Amino acid sequence: MESKTINDVVVSESNHELASSSPSEFEKNQKHYQEIIATLPHKDGWRPKDPFVEYGGHWWLQPLLEGLLHAQKFFKARPNDFFVCSYPKTGTTWLKALTFAIANRSKFDVSTNPLLKRNPHEFVPYIEIDFPFFPSVDVLKDEGNTLFSTHIPYDLLPESVVKSGCKIVYIWRDPKDTFVSMWTFAHKERSQQGPVVSIEEAFDKYCQGLSAYGPYLDHVLGYWKAYQANPDQILFLKYETMRADPLPYVKRLAEFMGYGFTKEEEEGNVVEKVVKLCSFETLKNLEANKGEKDREDRPAVYANSAYFRKGKVGDWQNYLTPEMVARIDGLMEEKFKGTGFLSSKS
């Protein structure tokens, strides 16, 4: 296999440049990333030993920022790649399962789909996490894999993702449910960085944009504007709308991906079978996603079960005060005023 050297880093010319590089090569670059990060503004995070770092107008946890810097420099997207983009806790796991099931339904029927045995995150790798930190996982070594994911804001995506013409699906969720899901999810992390702050303190930080991957509303708005400018390249979905009536959106997603369902498949209830396979209820109750079971391909700071809490719409009502609700609703109204977003059905 032919290789070339870029800035003293050996880069494979196979799948996505660094897909076959060893972790030690990332570590050589990691020191440089850490030197950059040391010069950037820091603020207290949701844990006492886990501060946020400002970069590119967004706030980051240091490991994620190291991964971003690496992906920006080395990840090379191809025109036929497909990206699941989202902010944390907005429906990512569900959307990963759907894209994998849609793209691979000619290889597996519902009874043999690998999703029944392993967590969806193993099949759709993060370019800012798996790509830099775990480049030897099977999915990154598979030259035929075209499914990738990221929580990176649109304006900081690797240049090749935007310019290659590869397609993107973005999912967003009510910011109140997103916050509650993030805060409860943080408690499930196997962390040595100290306890998670109270829900009141975390909410205040969240409203200031101090959460992983920066201000949530800016994240949504960035992808919304990109979708408005490039509707053929970006599909924009709303979690609550999909949960209420998944069938038409799964068909729309499949068509957008280039894997549209045939008339015969629709008559054979294949769409319904895909929806059921990837449903919250099905995935949550699989042995692979119960208890403290971990993903099989690499170490993880979360058990597989952490990704399946309730999957419900409106759970924020059990956590937020009227004052909190008014604050986040006001921020949303202000952020999206004049953008056409609030009147959209997406």
From Swiss-Prot:
The opening ranks of the lineage are:
Eukaryota, Viridiplantae, Streptophyta, Embryophyta, Tracheophyta
Induction, per UniProt? Induced by coronatine, but not by methyl jasmonate or high sulfate concentration.
Q: Report how activity changes across the pH range.
A: Optimum pH is 9.0.
Effect of changing residue 183 to R: reported as: In strain: cv. C24
Q: Which Pfam families match?
A: Sulfotransfer_1 (PF00685)
* MF annotations from Gene Ontology: aliphatic desulfoglucosinolate sulfotransferase activity; aromatic desulfoglucosinolate sulfotransferase activity
Name the positions where 3'-phosphoadenylyl sulfate binds: 89-94, 173, 181, 239, 309-311
* EC class (word): transferase
Q: Which family does it belong to?
A: Belongs to the sulfotransferase 1 family.
Tell me one GO biological process term: glucosinolate biosynthetic process
The protein here is known as Cytosolic sulfotransferase 17
Summary of activators and inhibitors of this protein? Inhibited by phosphoadenosine 5'-phosphate (PAP).
Listed under catalytic activity are: an aliphatic (Z)-desulfo-glucosinolate + 3'-phosphoadenylyl sulfate = a (Z)-omega-(methylsulfanyl)-N-sulfo-alkylhydroximate S-glucoside + adenosine 3',5'-bisphosphate + H(+)
The UniProt entry, under PANTHER family, shows: SULFOTRANSFERASE SULT
In this protein, the active site sits at 151 (proton acceptor)
Q: Where in the cell is it found?
A: Cytoplasm
Query: Which cellular component terms (GO) are annotated to the entry?
Result: cytoplasm; nucleus
Q: What is its main location?
A: cytoplasm
Q: Supply the EC number(s).
A: 2.8.2.38
